[in-house]
Every structure is written in C-alpha cells, then in structure tokens.
C-alpha cells in the first residue's frame, strides 16, 4: 500500500473551551479532540482525500487509547504511532477568547514523542510515501531529534520531497537559541518550508530578549527582527519553495528561481485561530500531491485556514473536500 504523506511529530489530546470568550478561570465545559501540528495536518489532508500516515508516539494510558482510536476513526494510518512505556500521553488545554486571545497550556512532561528513536525509524519503508512532512518541534530534544534527522536522510535516499512546517513552540526548547541553530542546519535538507513571518524570524533568534509571549499565546509569539532578511536567508539554504503565511491577507510563495507569488486569503469572521496553519498545510499538500500549480494549491491552503478560524476546535473541524470546494465557490472561486 502507498501513501501520499507521512507526518512526523507530536500528538495530543486537546481540550477546547466550549465557553467562547470565557477567561481560563471561568471555563465550565471542555470538548475533546486530538491535536499537535503534524497530527492536525495528517487528519486534515486525509479529510481532503489524501492517504496519510502519522509517525508519533503515545503513552500506555487511556489518553493514548483515545488518541489512537480517534486517529483510526479519521482513517489516518497509525502503524508508526508508537506506544512507549514509562511515558505519559500529551494533553493540551485551549482557551478561546476572540478576537485575539487563545491561551494554551501544554502538559508535556515525559512526552512520548520525545522518546522516539532511530530504532523506530528503521522500521519505516519510506519508498511507500510520496512526501515526508516534518514538524520543527520534533527537532527540539534527543532522542527524537536524531530520529528526525535519520528519517529525513531515509526520505531523501528514496527521493521524496521533505517538507518542513517550522511549527515554532518556544516552550519545547530549553534554550531558544538552540532552535535557530538546529533549524538552520535542518533547512539545508528541505525542499519546501512552511511558516509564519514570526516563525521565520525564530530561525534566526540570537537573544532570548527578541521573543515575547503574552497570556500563554504560545502559537502566536512576538519576535523582533527583519522578515525580508529572514526570507532571503531561508532561500539561501537552497529550498525549492517557501510558503509564508500572512494571516487574513493570505500567503506569499517564494520560488527557488526568484519568482514571488502573492496568494490572497478569504475574508471570514474569526472565532479561533488555533489549527488554522495546520489546515493551511493540509490544503497545500492536497494540491501539491495532485499536481496543482503553486497558486491554486496555496489558494486551497488559504481556504482551509480561513475555514478553520471560524470553528471552535482543530482537526475535528477540518473540512472535507466537497465542503471546502463549496466554500471557495461561495467566495468567488479559486
């Protein structure tokens, strides 16, 4: 059996506030889902119509069972989702306070995905995948970092594209400067890179004072620096395509030959920005794997991101193909 993409990184149970606008202390109800950037991408791409697999890990606990069962129900291949003893499955609690406050609390002590090893990678036949998508957070600690590097090496040996979603989460890095050091080395192995302007700046952080996170907005940090310089430096690493997400404005695609494409977004009333970037990546993957041109692929990506910001959750609200095409047509088409 062949697959369109294998995503690598974290998986969690996500608990979303059902009380829109409530402060964390006042949350009365939570709804359950699964999450983690590579998980959201795998589920989102599967709903659109791709065959997807997840390379991650859970603990030997009921939470891990919930995660595995949910992935099965979504049709994501879990052959390479490990159950690692003496670990505890990850949990995330998410507040939703529109228009711009979305606090996150991560519970990742002894996280299973951080214990993934080279031995786990040895069991993967990369020749059955059309692409390999890496979460930047999976590079944060050993032994998962070495596993990620080896997985990338194996992917390149069978000549499938390596796609990096920078997925910057400052909380995952003990020294924020390490993030830049590791990512700059990894970028030399990438064909396609996906990130926000802030995530591009994160690759070149030299001082912790460049970073600030307010009200636990882990997914939306403020980082000082020159975005245009960061874009140029990323392209200098030799990537074929850089996709820069610019929120409501859409995105900008930078090609290796110097071509720049601005792809407009879709106007919606935002409820929750969490997961929008992952939905974007899923949409792009669908177009890319199916041979669409960059503009159309990114237009679909923007639509998926816009769809997600109107929802009260992450991948449990990811659109199916017919839904997102209807959405695009209602907004004037591709």
Where are the regions that the model predicts?
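Glycine-rich phosphate/adenosyl-contacting loop at the front of the ribokinase-like
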Residues: 1-77, 93, 100, 116, ...
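Conserved phosphate-binding/catalytic region of the ribokinase-like
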Residues: 1-6, 153, 205-334
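Short, conserved phosphate/pyrophosphate- and ester-handling motifs at nucleotide-, phospho-/glycolipid
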Residues: 45, 196, 277
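Anion (oxyanion) recognition and catalysis
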Residues: 46, 72, 153-157, 187, ...
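Conserved N-terminal subdomain of the carbohydrate kinase-like
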Residues: 51-134, 325-334
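A short, aliphatic-rich alpha-helical micro-motif
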Residues: 125-127, 184-187, 236
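Conserved beta-alpha-beta core of the PfkB/ribokinase-like small-molecule kinase fold
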Residues: 131, 137-229, 249-251
